[in-house]
UniProtKB/Swiss-Prot annotation:
HAMAP family: MnmG_GidA. GO terms for cellular component: cytosol. Keywords: Cytoplasm, FAD, Flavoprotein, NAD, tRNA processing. Transmembrane segments: none annotated. It comes from the Bacteria. NAD(+) binds at residues 271-285. It is found in: Cytoplasm. Homodimer. Heterotetramer of two MnmE and two MnmG subunits. GO terms for biological process: tRNA methylation; tRNA wobble uridine modification. One of its GO terms (molecular function) is flavin adenine dinucleotide binding. This is tRNA uridine 5-carboxymethylaminomethyl modification enzyme MnmG. Belongs to the MnmG family.
Length: 632
């Protein structure tokens, strides 16, 4: 049976798939979301949390494009915390523990409420390809779904294999079959495939934990939502427990490490560097006498606890033994053993910046299939792939997230230009311009682009336009309120007596002054600003000097990406560059700096070194040419 009439088909109902389907539908594409089971849409397969350092920035950017993750997390969040709250705004990371059930139900409700989006239950087995481009999807039961654009968001399901000690079980996650047919399809297309792995800890019965003997970590007093559309958090907040592994824990693990699937040679996939198993921690950091374990409740009406920090692939009986040596867990009962899962992924260098496969028009990939790890990274790719699939289906130009204006752009550029050798995770350190790419200004950076693209709903557009007007009016007011140095000193603002008038905005750029200090000088004028607007302007003004410099640097980078490299450029003479990079650049012979930047292994530091050398060399050549002309 053939179904016609879809513009976009999304395969997979996880974090990438839900954002992809929603994004495509918001652009007006008739969209089908294909999933094994409707009730698994939005399932949190691993840890019950959203956001964090770098990751929280991605959630805010998804929200700025009118995506779903931020709003759903605000409904399901049961412990909101702003990480790095005491540090600068650029590195603060919004995060929440989430109730798994609430999150899944809220995401399903959001998908079901999206106009133009159908949910189709079943197993996508193969792609329908016609004249060198995607024509639809072939289901395992023989159904054919037709569409000019398909987004694959298969997560860990591509030839997924779960490991618990020596036991191996084909699965995409516990209790769900892997996807074998699509993996074969990708290999048949000639795409470069690799094998990665991730892992998860045992799930514990919270009723058997001695909560009195562990530390506690609660939510912040001031709960900061993810979404621009959320006015306040109303879900009840809970505490997490905090404990540590012991020498006895380590002894059991080390004595039995040969039984770990990771260390027995049974697993061929590469694991995530920044989310190591407890076995990895002991091998790499054996000198430590303990490792922190966060006991994270999985829901308000669920006694299951996720012990974050002890991911493992040891046999179940050894897991039970080492868990009982951790303070507070002496009597803990395991509900589900921890496990490692390995799966196929596609080399993301097979993709364009729109996440379309170069070898097959109309096929887009998003999420762990591209070598990333994490809900937020997957969701951000799903957003980009869904938008571009919808644009392709209407013969429109693709939309590319820029590296200079979004963390989504940083991630996609990293993936498509450099590829991955291990699961990719977002950090603020990956962005060259993180003072500009803050979590607090994601809406100001991206919502105007989303509105121009047409993927923002009327309510958000109206609220954002009003907010932007408030910001502009507030900024103008701050710049109009000025005082002389003597007037400032009389008001308690200690500045140099240099005769120059300074505005309220100028004072906010100084680290010693904030709105509280300025309201003593201008109580009536500044008292009218909403707290959210005042906070945004305070951060903006505080960074203003640096942002001006960074804006210039961004413009410089865009120019430098077009800078030509001489065909006979001698990379071996470039001191400070590794021998490996010298060899790769000499072999690739990039035409310009933009091409050099995507050579495998190139880092921002290496690009900067190349630019300095080229500027110096080309400046010398211009100077020599000028000297020759003068002598003539």
């Amino acid at each position: 049976m053939t179904n016609s009439g879809y513009n976009v088909i999304v395969i997979g109902g996880g974090h990438a798939g839900t954002e992809a389907a929603s994004a495509a539908a918001r652009l007006g594409a008739k969209t089908a979301l294909v999933t094994h089971r409707r009730d698994t849409i939005g399932v949190m397969s691993c840890n019950p949390a959203i956001g964090g350092l770098g990751k929280g920035h991605l959630v805010r950017e998804i929200d700025a494009m009118d995506g779903l993750m931020g709003r759903v997390a605000d409904v399901a969040g049961i412990q909101f915390r702003m990480l790095n709250r005491k540090k600068g705004a650029a590195v603060r990371g919004p995060r929440t523990q989430a109730d798994r059930k609430l999150y899944r139900l809220a995401m399903l409700a959001a998908i079901e409420a999206t106009p133009g989006l159908d949910i189709i239950e079943g197993d996508a087995f193969d792609l329908d390809v016609l004249d060198g481009r995607v024509a639809g999807v072939i289901m395992k039961d023989g159904r054919r779904l037709q569409a000019p654009a398909v987004v694959l968001t298969t997560g860990t399901f591509l030839r997924g294999l779960i490991h618990i000690g020596s036991e191996k079980t084909p699965a995409g996650r516990v209790g769900e079959a892997p996807s074998i047919g699509l993996s074969a399809t990708l290999a048949r297309l000639g795409l470069r495939l690799g094998r990665l792995k991730t892992g998860t800890p045992a799930r514990l019965d919270g009723k058997t934990i001695d909560w009195q003997s562990v530390g506690r970590q609660g939510a912040d007093e001031e709960l900061v939502p993810f979404s621009f559309m959320t006015d306040s958090i109303t879900t009840r907040q809970v505490e997490c427990g905090v404990t540590r592994t012991t020498e006895a824990t380590h002894r059991i693990i080390v004595d039995n490490i040969k039984h770990s699937a990771m260390y027995s040679g049974q697993i061929e996939g590469v694991g995530p560097r920044y989310c190591p198993s407890i076995e990895d921690k002991l091998v790499k950091f054996g000198e430590r006498d303990g490792h922190q374990v966060f006991l994270e409740p999985e829901g308000l009406d669920d006694d299951t606890v996720y012990p974050n920090g002890i991911s493992t692939s040891l046999p179940a009986e050894i897991q039970a033994a080492f868990i009982k040596t951790i303070p507070g867990l002496e009597s803990a009962r395991i509900l589900q053993p921890g496990y490692a899962i390995e799966y196929d992924h596609v080399d993301p260098r097979e993709l364009t910046p729109s996440l379309e496969v170069k070898r097959l028009r109309g096929l887009f990939l998003a999420g762990q299939i591209n070598g990333t790890t994490g809900y937020e990274e997957a969701a951000a790719q799903g957003l980009a792939a869904g938008l571009n699939a919808a644009l392709l289906s209407s013969d429109s130009e693709p939309f590319h997230f820029s590296r200079t204006s979004s963390y989504i752009g940083v991630m996609i550029d990293d993936l498509t230009s450099r590829g991955v050798t291990e699961p990719y995770r977002m950090f603020t350190s990956r962005a060259e311009y993180r003072l500009t790419l803050r979590a607090d200004n994601a809406d100001m950076r991206l919502t105007p682009l989303a509105m121009a693209l047409g993927c923002v709903g009327a309510e958000r557009a109206e609220r954002f336009t009003a907010y932007q007007a408030e910001i502009d009016a507030g900024r103008a007011q701050l710049m109009a309120l000025t005082v002389t140095p003597n007037e400032a000193r009389r008001a308690g603002l200690n500045i140099n007596l240099d005769g120059q008038r300074r505005s309220a905005y100028d004072f906010l750029s100084y680290p010693t002054y904030d709105f509280a200090a300025l309201r003593k000088v201008w109580p009536e004028e500044l008292g009218r600003l909403r707290p959210k607007v005042a906070e945004a302007l305070e951060i903006e003004a505080g960074y203003s000097v640096y942002l001006d410099r960074q804006a210039a640097a961004i413009a410089d980078q865009q120019r430098d990406e077009e800078r030509r490299i001489p065909a006979d450029f001698n990379y071996d003479a470039l001191s400070g560059l590794s021998n490996e990079l010298k060899a790769k650049l000499s072999a690739a012979r990039p035409f310009n700096v933009a091409q050099a930047a995507i050579v495998e292994g190139m880092t921002p530091a290496a690009v900067a070194l190349l630019l300095v050398h080229l500027r110096r060399q080309q400046g010398f050549e211009r100077q020599s040419a000028d000297t020759r002309s003068e002598s003539l």
